[in-house]
């Protein structure tokens, strides 16, 4: 049995069923691209083409495969929001009614572009759910908060009656973001800068004067949890958690509408997982910056394929850990392998050992149930 070809057949069928309404050739090329990324561990077209040809998934020349992938990125008929909306409609239904946490971040791509990104926290993984590619040096056609609001709406429509909390770092925290969350009945957990101001409540009484957080949190070991008013110009009544743990370079100055305490600090720490996701996307993992893409629309289509690949490798890595196989690929005394690398290595190992088709069907990231599609973190 040619395990790679069987996996390709199974994956192609799943994408076809998952994205009903999208042109058949577009779905096939997208599935082809995603599988190549997962097997290659790279988003660089040349490397993806090499692996697809080496494994017999395509009999075309490597250069022909590379041109096919490049045409996909340049194809204006592939409307990324339309494809992704269909995807979210299928997979987010599984998460309805649960308590969910999302991370908002902004990351540069080379020197010319920026990616506004929202990811769903699932255990130790951040799964991409919404993004926008914007110019880094020229004026945006939309305002920053219009973009964030649009991305939130792309998610909210699929999650009725669901508790959603948005986590964001200092560069994005402010009253506009709080208002976007409140308008959608989302909770917020934001980190503020030391220059931001507040008036705290002590035993029910409000401080008389405004103070910068930098005037309050002066040294490691300081902790304060309670209610306060923040931002002198656009004042907000909220809960504040001020923590400067020993051994840390900076304090965490957090606001939340769900209380103040160590719980909020622990929840904010989950945001760090998005850093690992972007490290995986860049030089230490998928290496998207080596793709030399300069046009926003081309990067948008590359991210469409890449983010599907991230969902897939997250599923594979979780299954590897669940089955107690992590030590086969990683050190026991410390964790050197990222989720991306662990998931890919586990898939390659399965392909080497596979003797029947059923074992390869389990590798796919989504399961079709009576109630719809379900994202499986393990198999």
Question: What label would you give each PLM region?
Answer:
Residues 62, 66-125, 130:
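Active-site-proximal, Lys/Arg-enriched surface segment
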Residues 37-73:
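Low-complexity, highly charged intrinsically disordered N-terminal segments
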Residues 1-44, 50-51, 84-85, 98-100, ...:
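Single, function-defining residue in the core of a domain
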